[in-house]
Amino acid sequence: MIKLLAKNGGVIQMTFSGVFTSKKFREQSAAYKLVKADFIKVNNLDEALDADKSKIDAFEEAYELEKPYDVGTLGLVLDHFEHVINLVGIDYVGIGSDFDGVSGILPETLKDVASYPNLIAGLLERGYTEQEIKKLLSGNLMRVWQQVEEYAASH
């Protein structure tokens, strides 16, 4: 799918979420889903009911405090970027941070936009040039955006 996206001139927007970068996170998440389903069944709860939802939310908070997720590291995010860059080339990769709605599942050093200098420093340390980093930060997305606007104007 990523190769097809690149072949068609698109850009994949890479997220920092442990869902995509950390095998351990995915394992923990799968285990949690089973425990949560069991909690709901044993307590005869319905996620659609507000009263039950508050009980489920309280369970989730307690569970996450007891068993915090391994959300990964900056290094794992950089490995994630490099894997895709090596797969399709830097011209087809961008930043799709996915900050909205993912609280608690991002690496400590990449929690919000103010953390971008950490990502940039990591890319520089791995030998990426400023020009390549500009492509990742916005250049590739803006290239595709321009192509979309040109297509829309001509049709």
Give residue spans per PLM region.
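Short acidic/histidine-rich active-site segments
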Residues: 13-19, 88-110
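Short, solvent-exposed loop/turn and secondary-structure capping segments
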Residues: 15, 23-25, 106, 146-149
